[in-house]
Every structure is written in C-alpha cells, then in structure tokens.
Amino acid sequence: MILLFTYIKLMVLLPLYYFTEYEMIFDVLLLNIKKSGSVLIKFCQWSIPRLNEMYNLDQKKIQKLEELYERCNFHSMEYTEKIYQKNFHESIYKKYDSIEEIASGSIGQVYRMKDKEGEAIALKIIHPNIDCELRTFQYILYLINLVKPIRDSIKYYFPINLTVFLEDFNSQTNLINEANNNLLFASMYRNNEYIIIPELITVSKQ
C-alpha cells in the first residue's frame, strides 16, 4: 500500500514538474523515485540514456539523476544477516568479520568484509521486496493501459519496449546469472594478465 501511494505521488509530481519546471519539485520527484523501490529506479537507469538520445535532456538534470546509479538507499544489516542465514544455513559471522557497506545500487548492495584469515571479500545482496515491487510496477502499467489517451501519449513520447526492460530486470535480480557471467569472463580472460576477474567463492539467487 505504501509503495502504491508513492507511485500515485509520482504521477502527480511528473506533470506538475513538466508544466512548471520548478527545481524543488524535481528534487522531491527524485526523492520519491528513490523511495519507490528497485524496479522504478532500475527503469529510470534503463530509460534515461534512451530518452536523452531522443530529446537531448537538460544535462544538469541528468547529473542529478545519476544519484540513482550509485547513491541508492541501503537496506538494513539485519536483512542481510537474515538472507545469508537463509541461503547458506549459517551465520554470516561464522566465516566473516569487519563487514561494512560499500555501495548500494538499484537492485542490490555490496559489502566489504574479511574472512577469518584476513582476506578481503566482497558480498552482494539483493534488496528486499523486489518481487512485490515488480508486481506493483506491472499493475500500474496494466492500469495505464486501460486509459487510452494516457496509453497513446506514453507510446508517442516514450517509445520504449517495456517487455525488454522487464526481462532484463528479472535476469539481473537472480545473482546466479551474474555468477555465471563471472565464470564465463574468468574463463575467457584467464590468460590475460591485464584483466583480472574476481574469484567466485559461493553464490545464491539472492
């Protein structure tokens, strides 16, 4: 319900900013996009370069929107501990110490930590509630498609294939796919001293 309310706020803010171009409205819009979850943030990341090519967007606004790439909201350490326990059937602290957040992206966040021998390790965890957020996003798209004037306007001004986006998003939310890509590149560049692919230790979907 909270997520749906955030989408409703965005639907009000978008046309309001379009007709006024007030900087404050843009900042509030950006804040609400960050609160709306992984799907909409990734959708913005995915669509902004395409729209920029089509419409030559204001570069100052593009720079602000770059916050959506590297400065997304962090989820809690408690959630990370829970997901690690669920997937590997042991506490994260059994093997690792000095766990600290490095960065948070649209789909997951990365930690730096050390194993018991002191070797540095990176850990990536998918953000919570992504399945729910995806269903909400698809429901909003369904409702938009029911209103012909809105649907036609979006297709005219925003000619982007949403099916491709949703397939790409689903692929990225499964870390096993990322692990397979890691192994593929490690094999491809195993004899190249200038390209170092991180060694994969263990993996789960989340």
Model-derived regions, located:
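Broad phosphate/nucleotide-binding scaffolds in NTP-utilizing and phosphate-metabolizing enzymes
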Residues: 1-206
